[in-house]
């Protein structure tokens, strides 16, 4: 895994990545946080998503969550990413990759897919974009 991340840093023109105390590598790419962490034989990519529209007070907006989950199912055949709620109830875009089958190019592709999905999801989760879609502007 160290060689994989070393090669990724080089291909991105960055200094070698350094893990935090929990062993998580935190990359900021196009203003998005992408966390990479080894988990057994997998590399887990996680990006927390600020989703103010997902909460209605102390409850979850079930309609929006259902829509997001349907989208995740639709892209599942093309992308390794899925949407999960973490222990705190925060929405996270996550991909689990087998380290044994992963090379630098493959990791870059998955990170690019992660960023593309974020660009698709985030406008759906911000109050301004929801208001403009329903004509409140």
Swiss-Prot record:
Entry GO terms, CC: cytoplasm; plasma membrane
Entry's localization field: Cytoplasm; Cell inner membrane
Chief localisation class: cytoplasm
Swiss-Prot/TrEMBL induction comment: Transcription is induced at 37 degrees Celsius but down-regulated at this temperature by calcium.
Keywords: Cell inner membrane, Cell membrane, Chaperone, Cytoplasm, Membrane, Plasmid
Quaternary context: Interacts with SycN to form a complex which specifically binds to YopN.
Name of the protein in question: Chaperone protein YscB
